[in-house]
Amino acid sequence: MIAETYKCKYCEREFRKESTLAVHLCEQKRRFQEEKEVGVQIGLQSYLKFYTMTQGSAKLKTYADFATSPYYKAFVKFGRHCVAINAINVPKFVEWVIKQNKKLDHWCKEAVYDEYLHEYIRREALTDALERGIEYTMKWSERTGHPAQDFLRYGNDNAVAFAISTGRISPWLVFNCESGQQYLEEMNADQTKIVWPWIDPDFWQKKFRDYPADQAYCEEILKQAGW
């Protein structure tokens, strides 16, 4: 009599006991269990975007294709990296690394994200910059109990420098409100070293001259909000 066996549908390994199969965890089974994880989903969408942009279509690609792809680990590593650094506008970041022909194994490099972010904050819509900055300061307010509009005015100076250097607070906000101007005037040498590359006054003053209506709108919104 042939003993009954239980086969893993992912790796096809056979077991004598169903209970052993139940606790078995092969690489493919693990990947399917991780499918709903945010970082894995970002990896999947990046994988699909890569095929769409480089080969014209990804319509027939499924999660099963992704999970069995030799590039699975690299894309998931990137997805988890985006979650870890709270990357700004992940879809745009993905498009950018593909258009720039960045090697997949370089997508998680800090220098690559910084290069993207420098370009992105210069080109993004004012409304996106305002929304992100206001949302960031509201979360700060929830943590500290201070009014959101006082982040640049009374927030920890190093925390403010970090927020600017990571794109949470855009130069649109820093240059166009009273508290931002005050912060710039009072920065110490270390903070200036961190912040200056991200606010590039020459570039932004030219941008404000080119888009006076946007600047006026930004100033008015921030003034009304008490910034």
Where do the model's predicted regions map?
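C-terminal recognition-helix end and immediately following basic linker
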Residues: 1-44
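Intrinsically disordered, low-complexity N-terminal regions enriched in serine/proline/glycine
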Residues: 5, 9, 46, 112-115, ...
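Charged, amphipathic alpha-helical linkers/stalks
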Residues: 33-77
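Intrinsically disordered, low-complexity regulatory/activation regions of eukaryotic proteins
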Residues: 63-227
